[in-house]
Swiss-Prot record:
HAMAP family reported for this sequence: Formamidase
InterPro entries (alphabetical): Aliph_Amidase/BUP (IPR050345), C-N_Hydrolase (IPR003010), C-N_Hydrolase_sf (IPR036526), Formamidase (IPR022843)
Family membership: Belongs to the carbon-nitrogen hydrolase superfamily. Aliphatic amidase family.
Protein name: Formamidase
Organism, scientific name: Helicobacter acinonychis (strain Sheeba)
UniProt KW Lipid metabolism keyword: no
All copies of domain CN hydrolase, residue ranges: 14-260
GO molecular function: formamidase activity; N-carbamoylputrescine amidase activity
Length: 334
C-alpha cells in the first residue's frame, strides 16, 4: 500500500474511506434528523466519487453532536434499531458498502445513564457489530461504561473488524483485546478536541505496532463555538508506520488501501517483534513453548477486581463534580 490514497478497489484487500465530518452544532431533534440525512448523503457521494470503496467510517458524535447542556436528555438519545440506524442500514444496502456510525444510545435500564455507541453495518443492511464505549473520556463524558466487551466481526477483503471510540484508543489493553480475538483492522472513531492531537497520532501508531494490525482512525473536524476538533484521519500499517495522514479540514475524505492478509502473514511468519505472541510465550528459545505466566500484577488485580494504584488515595479528580455532575450515580441529566 502506498500513501496516496485511492479511488478503486484493490485486487486483494479493500479500500476504506474515513470522513472528517464537520462537528455538528445540535440544539434540537430536528438538527439530529438533518445530521442523519447529511451523513447518508455523504455516504452515497463518497461511494460515487470512490467507486471501489467498501468501508466508509464516520466519527464519534457525528449524529448527535456535543451539546453538553442537552446530550443526556431523552430528546437527544437514540436506539440501535431505531429509525435513525435503520436509515443508515438502508443507505449501506443501497450503496453496497460497510458503514461505521456513532450514536448516543438510550440505556435499556432507565436508572442508568446512556451509552456512547458505535455500530458496523454490512452491505446487506445488517448491523453486524454493536459496541458500547468501554472507557468514557472522564471526567468530561457522562456515559455509562460499556457492557459488550470488545466484539469483532467479519469485514471486507478478509478483514476482521473491531471498533473503539475516542478515549478507548488511549487504553492499550483494548487494542490488544481486539487483536487477541482476531481483529486485523482496528477502527477508531473520535470527537477529540486539540488537547490530545499528538497523543492521537502516537496511539494510532502504537496500537497498530503492538498488535500487528492496521488501524483506521477518524476524528471530527472544525469549530463548535467551544472547541476545535482536529480531523487528522490516519491509516497505519501493521508495522506502526503511517500510510495516510489527513489534515485539519472538515469534509476531508481520507482513503487508503488495506491488505488484511499482510497483517495475518506477519502474525504467522514473524519471529522478531511478534510481541502479541511473545506476551504469553516468554523465552520460548530457552524454554520450549515459553513461559505462559507473564507475572503482570496489574492483570491479575484487574481479573480479581482489585486494581488499585499506589497513589490512588491521593488523586484529586475521581468523579465528575468538576463538570457539575452529581456524584451519587444513577440516571441524571434527563
Amino acid at each position: 500500500m502506498g500513501s496516496i490514497g485511492s479511488i478503486g478497489k484493490p485486487i486483494e484487500g479493500f479500500l476504506v474511506a474515513a470522513i472528517q465530518f464537520p462537528v455538528p452544532i445540535v440544539n434540537s431533534k430536528k438538527d439530529i434528523e438533518n445530521n442523519v440525512q447529511s451523513i447518508i448523503r455523504t455516504l452515497h457521494a463518497t461511494k460515487a466519487g470512490y467507486p471501489g470503496v467498501e468501508l466508509i467510517i464516520f466519527p464519534e458524535y457525528s449524529t448527535q453532536g456535543l451539546n453538553t447542556a442537552k446530550w443526556l436528555s431523552e430528546e437527544f438519545l437514540l436506539d440501535v434499531g431505531g429509525k435513525e440506524t435503520e436509515a443508515y442500514a438502508q443507505a449501506c444496502k443501497e450503496a453496497k458498502v460497510y458503514g461505521v456510525f456513532s450514536i448516543m444510545e438510550r440505556n435499556p435500564d432507565p436508572n442508568k445513564n446512556p451509552y456512547n455507541t458505535a455500530i458496523i453495518i454490512n452491505p446487506k443492511g445488517e448491523i453486524i457489530l454493536h459496541y458500547r464505549k468501554l472507557f468514557p473520556w472522564n471526567p468530561i463524558e457522562p456515559w455509562y461504561p460499556g457492557d459488550k466487551g470488545m466484539p469483532v466481526c467479519d469485514g471486507p477483503g478478509g478483514s476482521k473488524l473491531a471498533v473503539c471510540i475516542c478515549h478507548d484508543g488511549m487504553i492499550p489493553e483494548l487494542a490488544r483485546e481486539a487483536a487477541y480475538k482476531g481483529c486485523n483492522v482496528y477502527i477508531r472513531i473520535s470527537g477529540y478536541s486539540t488537547q490530545v492531537n499528538d497523543q492521537w497520532i502516537l496511539t494510532n501508531r502504537s496500537n497498530a505496532w503492538h498488535n500487528l494490525m492496521y488501524t483506521v482512525s477518524v476524528n471530527l473536524a472544525g469549530y463548535d463555538n467551544v472547541f476545535y476538533y482536529f480531523g487528522e484521519g490516519q491509516i497505519c500499517n501493521f508495522d506502526g508506520t503511517t500510510l495516510v495522514q489527513g489534515h485539519r479540514n472538515p469534509w476531508e475524505i481520507v482513503t487508503g488501501e488495506i491488505y488484511p492478509k499482510m497483517a495475518d502473514n506477519a502474525r504467522l511468519s514473524w519471529g522478531l517483534e511478534n510481541n502479541i505472541y511473545n506476551l504469553g510465550h516468554r523465552g520460548y528459545v530457552a524454554k520450549p513453548g515459553g513461559e505462559p505466566d507473564a507475572g503482570l500484577t496489574y492483570i491479575k488485580d484487574l481479573a480479581a477486581s482489585k486494581y488499585k494504584l499506589p497513589w490512588e488515595d491521593h488523586m484529586q479528580i475521581k468523579d465528575g463534580s468538576i463538570y457539575g455532575y452529581p456524584t451519587s450515580g444513577g440516571r441524571f441529566g434527563k
